């Protein structure tokens, strides 16, 4: 499990918007958000650019 869904919703994005902004398919984005696929380095970097105040550990590993 990760905090990606929570972060996305807090910032007013839907899954389609996030997938488009990250340059991935909706299906891939959904799998990562649901914890059914691991995020690659580029995916993590793009998320960090979109949400610079959140740490990678918080977003993907639920660590403060």
Set out the residue ranges of the language-model regions.
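DNA major-groove recognition helix of helix-turn-helix/homeodomain DNA-binding modules
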Residues: 42-58
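Conserved functional loop/turn residues at catalytic and ligand-binding sites
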Residues: 12, 17, 33-36, 63
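Residues in the helix-turn-helix
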Residues: 17, 28, 58
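Recognition helix of helix-turn-helix/homeodomain-like DNA-binding domains
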Residues: 23-38
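Short basic helix-loop element that most often maps to the first helix and adjoining turn
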Residues: 2-17, 21, 46
């Amino acid at each position: 499990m990760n905090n990606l869904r929570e972060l996305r919703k807090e910032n007013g994005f839907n899954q389609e918007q996030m997938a488009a902004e990250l340059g991935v398919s909706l299906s891939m984005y959904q799998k990562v958000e649901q914890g059914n696929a691991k995020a690659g380095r580029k995916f993590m970097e793009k998320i960090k650019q979109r949400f610079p105040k959140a740490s990678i550990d918080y977003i993907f590993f639920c660590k403060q």
